[in-house]
From Swiss-Prot:
Protein name per Swiss-Prot or TrEMBL: Conotoxin ArMKLT2-032
Organism: Conus arenatus
GO molecular function, one term: toxin activity
Chief site of localization: secreted
S-S bonds: C48-C62, C55-C66, C61-C73
Domain of life assignment: Eukaryota
Length: 76
């Protein structure tokens, strides 16, 4: 019985938190948050290295192929 009461109170508390958070974002703050997130992602995005460029790992190459022995991106 005590466990049931604790679970009901926890669910009500979490529901109240969700409603409060949803109300905050519906006032226009969500738009600003989305813009900040986009700016942050664009700073973290790296451009790939073209074919013939230097590479250390295949993930850096636009073609996804790096010959590590010569350190160059190659075409697939």
């Amino acid at each position: 019985m005590k466990l049931t009461c604790v679970l009901i109170i926890a669910v009500l508390f979490l529901t109240a938190c969700q409603l409060t958070t949803g109300e905050t974002y519906s006032r226009g703050e969500q738009k600003d948050h989305a813009l900040r997130s986009t700016d942050k992602n664009s700073k973290l995005t790296r451009q790939c290295t073209p074919v013939g460029g230097y590479c250390f790992d295949h993930h850096h190459c636009c073609s996804n192929h790096c010959i590590k022995s010569i350190g160059r991106c190659v075409a697939h």
